[in-house]
Amino acid sequence: MAKFVFVTGGVVSSIGKGIVAASLGRLLKSRGYSVSILKLDPYLNVDPGTMSPYQHGEVFVTEDGAETDLDLGHYERFTDTAMSRLNSVTTGSIYQSVINKERRGDYNGGTVQVIPHITGEIRERIHRVASNSNADVVITEIGGTVGDIESLPFLEAIREFRGDVGRHDLAYIHVTLLPYIGTSGELKTKPTQHSVKELRSIGIQPDVLVCRSDREINAELKRKIGGFCGVHERAVIPSLDADSIYAVPQTLEEQGLCREVLDVLNLTDHDSDMRAWQQLVHKMRNPGPAVKVALVGKYVQLNDAYLSVVEALRHACLAQDASLDLHWVCAEEIENRGADALLHGMDAVVVPGGFGNRGVDGKVAAIRWAREQRIPFLGLCLGMQCAVIEWARNLAGLTDATSAELEPGTSHPVIHLLPEQQDVVDLGGTMRLGVYPCRIAEGSMADRLYGDEVVYERHRHRYEFNNAYRNLFLESGYRISGSSPDGRLVELIELPEHPFFTACQYHPEFLSRPGQPHPLFRGLIEAAQQRLPNSPSEIKATA
C-alpha cells in the first residue's frame, strides 16, 4: 500500500514547493523507493494548455499527451520517472468532473456541494495516482499559498485524507519563508508561526517544516520555530538559497528531510546512493569554457516560458564540460534591429516553440543568419516551421511562403494544418499531443546523434510540413532526417552541408535529464564548442 506526502506552502507564493517535492522524490528514489508526484493547481482552467505563457510559464507535455504545469517537468527531471495526465489536477478539472457526474445522475438527486463532493473527487484523484503508478510513496504538491481562498478545497481534501489511510501512512510538509530584516539583523519567525496557525485552523498539523532563508538558521531559531509550531526541532529543516536547483536535494539530505519523512511514514531509512547526483552538482559548479547560446523567442520577458529548453541546454553543457552563457533575444527586436546586431558573437542559436504571428519574421531572420553564418542552429516545433519558411523564401524563391496558421490565404502554405485537425473547433487539449514514434533516416546527422532507428518524442502542434513542397525541399540540399513510420509526417530536418543545422516538429526538451541530455541538444553544444578558441579538432563522440 502506498504512503502519501503532502507539500503545502505559506507566507509567500513561489516559495519552492515544487523543488522541495521533486527533491524529496529524488531522495526517496536514492533509497530504493518508487515515487510518483502530482500537482494540485487551484485555478479554474481545466489545464494550462490555453493559458498565456506570461501568466503561467511553460506548458509541460506528458507522454500520454496531457498539457500540465511546469512543475511536472521538475518532477520528471529530478526523479527520472515519467508522469501522466493523472499527475496534474486543477480546480477546473475537478469541477468539470463533478458537474458531469451530476448531469449523468450519478449523485441520485442529492445536493452537490464542495464538501463532500468536490473534496471527495480530489481525494479520488490522489488515490488514482497511487493505484495506477504502484508507487511506494505518492507526493502531492498543493499549489497556491495557505490562506488563499482558492486552495481551501484542496487543503480540506488532504485533511480528510487522514480518514482514508492510517496515521503512519501520510505526512504533511509545510514550506515557509524566514525573512531577514536588515535593520534588526534578524531572521523573523512570526510569518511562519502565523502560516502554521492558519494551517492548524483548517485541521492540518505539519509534521515537517522546510524553512527557506538566504542565511544560516541556528539551533536556537530552530527550537523556537519548533516550539511555537508544534514540530520537533529536528523536523525544522533549513533550506538556504542554492546556486542551482540541482543542489537542493543534497542540501535537504544533509538537513535530514528524508529521514524525518520516513520516520513519520514508518518506513525504513535505507542507505542513500546520491553519488551520481553529487557528481553532477560538482560538475555544474566547476564548468568548462562557456558557449554563447542565443534563445530567440516570443516570450523571453518570462524565462519560465522556456524552462525545459533552458534546462536541456544546461544538461547538454554539463555532459560536454561546458558552461552555458545564455542570451535571451526577443524575436521582435530582430525585426527592428536586424539579426546580426543581436546575434553577432553567438556560438549557437535556438528557436523554440510558440504560437501566433508576432515575432515570426524575427525568428525567420535569425534562422537565415545562422544558416548563412554557419552558426549551429536548433529549431523546436514552431522553430522547425520557421526554418521551412526561411528555406522557401530565401532559397526556393517562394517569397510569400508562410504557414497557413499565420496567413490562411497564402499562395504558398509550406506549413499547413494536419488533416485530422480540419474539423477541430475547441482549443483546449485538441492538438497532436504526447509521444509519437519517429523513424530516423540512416546515415543522417540525426542517426549519428540518436543511434536508434526509431525514437519516441513528445509533440504539441496542429500544423505540419506541407508535403506538396517535399521534392522541392529535398532538391535544395536539405534532408528529411526523421519522419512518422508511414513517412507521411516530416518530424526532423537538417542541412548536411552546415556544421549543425537541424530542426524538429516535436519537443525534445521534455525528455532531457541532468544525467542524460537529449541527443539533439548535446549535438548542438558539441558543434558550438568547435567555435571556441583551442577547441578540439574533432567533435567528441556522443555517449
Curated annotation (Swiss-Prot):
UniProt cross-references to CDD domains, sorted A to Z: CTPS_N, GATase1_CTP_Synthase
Chain sites annotated for binding L-glutamine: 54, 354, 382-385, 405, 462
Active site: residue positions: 381 (nucleophile), 507, 509
GO molecular function annotations of the record: ATP binding; CTP synthase activity; glutaminase activity; identical protein binding; metal ion binding
Entry EC number(s): 6.3.4.2
A GO term from the CC aspect: cytosol
Residues that hold ATP according to the record: 14-19, 71
Stretches that traverse the bilayer: none
Pathway: Pyrimidine metabolism; CTP biosynthesis via de novo pathway; CTP from UDP: step 2/2
Key words of the record: ATP-binding, Glutamine amidotransferase, Ligase, Magnesium, Metal-binding, Nucleotide-binding, Pyrimidine biosynthesis
GO BP, sorted A to Z: 'de novo' CTP biosynthetic process; pyrimidine nucleobase biosynthetic process
Region (Amidoligase domain): 1-267
Stored PROSITE patterns: GATASE_TYPE_1
Binding-site residues for CTP, renumbered to this chain: 13, 148-150, 188-193, 224
Binding site for Mg(2+): 71, 141
Reactions accelerated catalytically: UTP + L-glutamine + ATP + H2O = CTP + L-glutamate + ADP + phosphate + 2 H(+); L-glutamine + H2O = L-glutamate + NH4(+); UTP + NH4(+) + ATP = CTP + ADP + phosphate + 2 H(+)
Domain Glutamine amidotransferase type-1, chain residue ranges per copy: 292-534
Regulation acting on activity, per entry: Allosterically activated by GTP, when glutamine is the substrate; GTP has no effect on the reaction when ammonia is the substrate. The allosteric effector GTP functions by stabilizing the protein conformation that binds the tetrahedral intermediate(s) formed during glutamine hydrolysis. Inhibited by the product CTP, via allosteric rather than competitive inhibition.
List of residues binding UTP: 13, 188-193, 224
Quaternary state and interactors: Homotetramer.
Role, per record: Catalyzes the ATP-dependent amination of UTP to CTP with either L-glutamine or ammonia as the source of nitrogen. Regulates intracellular CTP levels through interactions with the four ribonucleotide triphosphates.
Family statement: Belongs to the CTP synthase family.
NCBIfam families in alphabetical order: PRK05380.1 (NF003792), PyrG (TIGR00337)
Note: CTPSs have evolved a hybrid strategy for distinguishing between UTP and CTP. The overlapping regions of the product feedback inhibitory and substrate sites recognize a common feature in both compounds, the triphosphate moiety. To differentiate isosteric substrate and product pyrimidine rings, an additional pocket far from the expected kinase/ligase catalytic site, specifically recognizes the cytosine and ribose portions of the product inhibitor.
Protein name: CTP synthase
Organism, scientific name: Synechococcus sp. (strain WH7803)
Gene: pyrG
